[in-house]
A protein has these predicted regions:
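The feature marks the mature, well-folded catalytic cores of soluble enzymes
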Residues: 1-351
Length: 351
């Protein structure tokens, strides 16, 4: 980008977080009651962090949603039609330069044409753009928000397994991706990691399930140090080593790995690294597992200046994702003033 915009790190001050409400027409149907409860707890936690919520809701579900929310909650309901609720991967990203902020979007094709994404891919231009001060800039590249992690210095992380899936961008090379990340997102350096993948992950190894930055040159890594006999142990140990080699000056915090299977015996990709940072708070997924307590302790060590807020995400991981996957932050300076003003009125529906 000639304007020298750079993708903002997640800990940049936020006006809001966007979510897409689960309903019976999504894949959440078997766990709908439990999943809605998780969303309501996330909304409550975000409001306590002084973060507003932009909530996409199908028009037929708005009445039910209003009944479940407290009238005083700072939530703006926006009518939208979407394929799925994983808004991390199709919601717009936010870049900034000295002049201001710029929302940007990539093409979303259902994680390499695995699932229909025709509705999700239109959400930014058809729905969310109405809330933004600037038009949402579109890039001719298939990419997902969960595949990108950046710090305040412009160091960007992604994973080779995800980027090289030929159903995303054909045979596009890593070198070509790195040039695009520099041009589109202002990345000063892009490290594409070769190791790490969780069983049951449909995304081909999104970085937000594996490695996250801290503001103090730290790396929080989903490891399996507590399970040396686990099928993930070698791959995640190699990921830790790879991060040490690429970023030797970073302090590393390894998270334990829980073991969760669904009733069909499938391993679920439960990751403690799939947390959401919002205004000096971190909403940290827990899974009602023995490892939860240790994971929270490690998170507090990694982010000493943040309040760690545990959220039970066991219902979310039944659909092979977690907390970060269902959310996307909106930094201060993106939303129109009248949109921000609407949050002061409690729950409202955007007209």
């Amino acid at each position: 980008m000639t304007e020298n915009y750079q993708l903002l790190p997640e800990w940049a001050q936020q006006d809001a977080v966007m979510l897409a409400w689960p309903d019976k027409s999504t894949d959440w149907q078997p766990w709908l009651s439990e999943v809605k409860s998780v969303y309501l707890k996330i909304i409550e936690a975000l409001n306590q962090a002084n973060t507003n919520v932009v909530l996409l809701v199908r028009s037929s579900e708005i009445s039910d949603c209003l009944d479940r929310l407290k009238k005083s909650q700072k939530v703006l309901i926006v009518s939208a039609d979407y394929n799925d609720t994983w808004i991390r991967d199709y919601g717009f990203l936010s870049c900034a330069n000295e002049s201001g902020l710029q929302p940007v979007e990539f093409i979303f094709n259902g994680w390499g044409q695995k699932f229909d994404a025709s509705k999700d891919n239109k959400i930014n231009q058809n729905v969310l753009s109405r809330l933004c001060q600037q038009p949402i800039k579109s890039f001719d590249l298939v990419a997902e928000g969960g595949a990108l992690e950046i710090d305040q210095n412009g160091l960007l992380l992604s994973t080779e397994l995800c980027l090289t899936n030929p159903k995303r961008n054909g045979g596009k090379s890593i070198d070509s991706y790195q040039k695009d990340f520099q041009q589109f997102l202002g990345a000063k350096q892009s490290i594409i990691l070769q190791n790490g993948h969780l069983e049951g992950d449909d995304t081909d190894g999104h970085i937000d399930t594996l490695v996250r930055f801290t503001p103090n040159s730290g790396l929080v890594i989903q490891s399996a140090f507590n399970r040396p006999d686990d099928s993930h142990f070698q791959g995640l140990a190699a990921l830790v080593k790879e991060c040490q080699q690429h970023m030797p000056s970073h302090e590393i915090f390894e998270l334990p790995l829980p073991y969760i299977v669904n009733p069909q015996g499938e391993r679920l990709p439960a990751s403690y690294a799939n947390f959401l940072i919002s205004n000096q708070h971190i909403l940290c997924p827990i899974y009602q597992q023995p490892e939860d307590k240790l994971a929270i302790q490690i998170m507090q060590n990694a982010y000493p200046e943040f309040s760690i807020v545990p959220i039970n995400c066991l219902p979310l991981v039944q659909q092979f994702g977690s907390l970060h996957c269902i959310s996307m932050q909106i930094p201060c300076g993106i939303l129109k003033p009248e949109v921000l003003q609407s949050f002061n009125n409690g729950v409202s529906v955007y007209e």
